[in-house]
């Protein structure tokens, strides 16, 4: 066997060996009402961070986006917006409004750090997604491991040690970002309804059906009257409303249970 064929065979064997799996692409998911940014590897959750989204008057945009680069130690330039009138340029530094790093996902909108720790978990920004500085640094390190491996951990440490010098890192692969607005969520047998922070009238029967289906439930025989009763109990609340699915919809079964039933 030639040297070339030997190398190919060894590489193939390594990939197919038990316990050796190729890393799946990382993607980010933000459901605005939950104020949490979730990191997925394939379909597996690997990280979850509390965030601050845009306030009702300056909502965070929803849709599908991608992150192409990171700016470490960013400056802040007031955008051409009414709310920024009279604001002054802020150079890079520990107290910069952008924090230690910002991740661009669409013009004028970023995922970034913040010195305003108390804002995390609330709709408080002008549309950007704010994170605790420690969290956005940890997230950015993870993205660099997958999409910019040429920038080492030691190099990032050196960048962070000089907070007044901005450094841009371009990713070799785009990081997918999904931002959605779904106040009704079903997880681990519990149905939760988050405050409708943008007053979109988004707590409704269709949203309940969708959340239950996404949670693995068979909604074919779901009683519409029970759904309407639940919506009336849950809507227009300022805090999270949650109950076990079995309590809200007593006769509802998961799809797996429905299939296995005699």
Label the predicted regions.
Residues 2-262:
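N-terminal pre-domains immediately preceding structured catalytic cores
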């Amino acid at each position: 066997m030639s040297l070339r064929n030997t190398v190919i065979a060894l590489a193939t064997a390594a990939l197919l060996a038990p316990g050796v799996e190729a890393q799946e692409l990382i993607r980010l998911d933000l459901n605005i009402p939950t104020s949490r940014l979730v990191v997925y590897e394939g379909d597996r959750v690997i990280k979850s961070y509390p965030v601050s989204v845009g306030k009702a008057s300056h909502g965070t945009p929803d849709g599908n986006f991608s992150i192409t680069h990171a700016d470490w130690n960013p400056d802040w330039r007031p955008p051409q917006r009414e709310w920024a009138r009279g604001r002054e340029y802020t150079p890079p530094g520990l107290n910069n409004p952008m924090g230690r790093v910002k991740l661009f996902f669409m013009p004028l909108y970023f995922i970034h750090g913040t010195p305003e720790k108390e804002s995390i978990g609330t709709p408080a920004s002008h549309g950007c997604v704010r994170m605790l500085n420690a969290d956005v640094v940890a997230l950015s390190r993870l993205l660099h491991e997958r999409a910019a491996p040429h920038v080492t951990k030691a190099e990032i440490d050196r960048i962070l040690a000089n907070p007044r010098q901005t450094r841009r890192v371009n990713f070799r692969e785009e990081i997918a970002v999904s931002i959605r607005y779904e106040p009704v969520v079903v997880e681990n047998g519990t149905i939760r309804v988050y405050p409708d922070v943008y007053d979109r009238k988004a707590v409704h029967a269709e949203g309940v059906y969708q959340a239950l289906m996404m949670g693995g439930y068979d909604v074919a025989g779901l009683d519409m009257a029970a759904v309407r009763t639940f919506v009336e109990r849950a809507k227009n609340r300022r805090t999270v409303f949650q109950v076990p699915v079995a309590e809200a919809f007593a006769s509802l079964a998961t799809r797996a249970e429905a299939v296995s039933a005699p």
